[in-house]
Every structure is written in C-alpha cells, then in structure tokens.
C-alpha cells in the first residue's frame, strides 16, 4: 500500500521545480525589491487576513473595511510588479486546480458508483 503522505511530500517538492512555481517565486522576489509596491502588498495581505478572521468568527464587515480593502486593491492594480505577481499566481493556481481534480477523482468515482 502506498504511503499517500510520502507521495504528497514528493508532490510538494516537485511543485517547487515547475515553471509556474519558479515564475511565481521570481515575481515575488522582484516585488520585494520595490519597497512601495511591497508595502502595499503587505498592507493588503494584513487587511485580507483581518477580514478572514472576522468572517470565521461570524462577524460582519463594516462598509469602511470593505471600502478600505477595495481602495487598496485599486492602488495595487496600477503597479506593474503586483500585476506581474498576480498573473503568476493565476498560472500556479490553474496548475493546482488541475492537480486537485486528479487527486479528488477517486472520491468523485465513489459517489458516481464507479
């Protein structure tokens, strides 16, 4: 019987060698060189984290919180290193979605009676 955890750890190592991952890492490294862009990125991540925490606790967001996050997102859209990072995230996300479909297929097969 295969040890799925060993397989998962190998997959994690293999992901690091993909072009999608390497492109993301390079884009992030370039973003960090732009102190203004990186600062906005960190602010956005922090606000996003805070809102996720509120959501998990069943709390509603204030209009000001939503507006603040949207304004920060709008600022970020105009910054090339952030746009580049987002594009590379999208490429990696597509690969991860495909991998998730493959990994989930046995469960789907059970429910479809295969």
UniProtKB/Swiss-Prot annotation:
Transmembrane segments: none annotated. Gene3D superfamilies: YheA/YmcA-like. Coiled coil: none annotated. InterPro entries: Com_YlbF, YheA/YmcA-like_dom_sf. Belongs to the UPF0342 family. This is UPF0342 protein LSEI_1724. It comes from Lacticaseibacillus paracasei (strain ATCC 334 / BCRC 17002 / CCUG 31169 / CIP 107868 / KCTC 3260 / NRRL B-441) (Lactobacillus paracasei). The lineage of its organism: Bacteria, Bacillati, Bacillota, Bacilli, Lactobacillales.
């Amino acid at each position: 019987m295969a040890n799925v955890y060993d397989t998962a750890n190998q997959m994690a190592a293999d992901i690091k060698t993909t072009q999608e991952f390497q492109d993301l890492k390079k884009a992030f490294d370039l973003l960090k060189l732009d102190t203004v862009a990186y600062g906005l990125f960190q602010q956005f991540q922090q606000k996003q984290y805070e809102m996720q925490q509120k959501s998990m606790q069943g709390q509603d967001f204030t209009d000001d919180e939503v507006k603040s996050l949207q304004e920060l997102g709008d600022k970020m859209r105009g910054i090339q290193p952030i746009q580049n990072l987002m594009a590379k995230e999208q490429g990696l996300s597509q690969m991860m979605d495909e991998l998730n479909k493959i990994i989930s297929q046995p469960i789907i097969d059970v429910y479809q009676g295969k």
